[in-house]
């Protein structure tokens, strides 16, 4: 049963399975991408932004003579590590750790297939070849802001990139790492598949939010548990389902999908959640940042009405 649920979670994001025409009854609105059709949206550069800048990682390890040797950890960008990223968007520790603790220890959305938390060092010239970047402690040498954090596979075609993006030798044969991953070119930084804008799971969570605002936690929990049961997560208890719980559940279900800032602003939780969970922006964010300033040009254009600027600007 666990494997069936695992495949159900993964299937939602595999190639050619986002649209209702493919039998996916969860999709509501899907953005269409065709990288081979210049008349279409050709790419969704999620990997470029969300995946860390791992390809230039350098580590120091001792060789057989006991000498410290500094080399790159990886041969380059690979399809097994979600393509080329530059680490523009790094999720918080709250996402990578906190939300998967109580009641979500067995949550398939956090499985090693959906969030890759460790990878093997694949450069044969490194004394650390074959060891694990995290388990064996090499990640401690790195810039954890951009160079390394877990890989979120839903945004990419992991181990299934279009062949046009493979690196090849002089005879046209694909180049691979010793561990079977295809080396890909630097422009391999997209999803190369259609992308959900809305799907049914979010609808359940929206209705759960409405029930919470009405004070009906039992119905809110029922909707939340419709989503959680598929992921093999423990059921939420009505007493614990509040707006913060729903925001955490949206993280678990919709990470790398929803426009998170819009959700937080809509709920009036932007400043609060940043102060609690984001050590970088939390130090400087103010309550008034929940609304953006109205452009002065728009205020000027409305000659028949007085438009007040949003507070704080």
Explain the meaning of each model-derived region.
Residues 65, 72-199:
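Flexible, polar/acidic helix-loop-strand segments at domain edges
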């Amino acid at each position: 049963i666990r494997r069936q649920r695992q495949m159900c979670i993964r299937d939602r994001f595999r190639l050619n399975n986002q649209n209702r025409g493919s039998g996916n009854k969860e999709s509501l609105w899907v953005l269409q991408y065709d990288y081979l059709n210049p008349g279409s949206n050709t790419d969704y550069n999620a990997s470029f932004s969300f995946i860390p800048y791992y390809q230039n990682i350098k580590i120091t390890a001792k060789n057989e003579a006991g000498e410290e040797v500094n080399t790159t950890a990886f041969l380059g960008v690979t399809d097994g590590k979600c393509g080329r990223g530059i680490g523009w968007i790094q999720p918080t520790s709250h996402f990578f750790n906190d939300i998967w603790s109580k009641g979500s220890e067995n949550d398939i959305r956090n499985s090693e297939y959906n969030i890759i938390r460790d990878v093997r060092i694949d450069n044969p010239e490194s004394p650390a070849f074959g060891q694990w970047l995290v388990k064996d402690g090499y990640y401690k040498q790195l810039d954890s802001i951009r160079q390394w954090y877990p890989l979120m596979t839903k945004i990419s075609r992991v181990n299934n990139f279009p062949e046009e993006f493979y690196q090849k030798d002089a005879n046209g044969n694909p180049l691979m790492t010793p561990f079977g991953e295809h080396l890909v070119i630097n422009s391999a930084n997209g999803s190369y598949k259609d992308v959900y804008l809305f799907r049914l799971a979010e609808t359940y969570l929206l209705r759960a939010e409405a029930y919470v605002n009405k004070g009906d936690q039992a119905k809110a929990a029922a909707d939340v548990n419709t989503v959680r049961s598929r992921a093999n997560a423990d059921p939420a208890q009505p007493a614990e389902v509040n707006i913060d719980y729903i925001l955490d559940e949206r993280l678990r279900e919709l990470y790398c999908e929803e426009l998170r800032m819009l959700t937080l602003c809509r709920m009036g939780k932007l400043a609060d959640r940043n102060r609690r969970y984001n050590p970088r922006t939390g130090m400087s964010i103010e309550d008034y940042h929940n609304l953006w300033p109205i452009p002065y040009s728009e205020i000027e254009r409305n000659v028949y009405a007085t438009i007040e600027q949003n507070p704080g600007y």
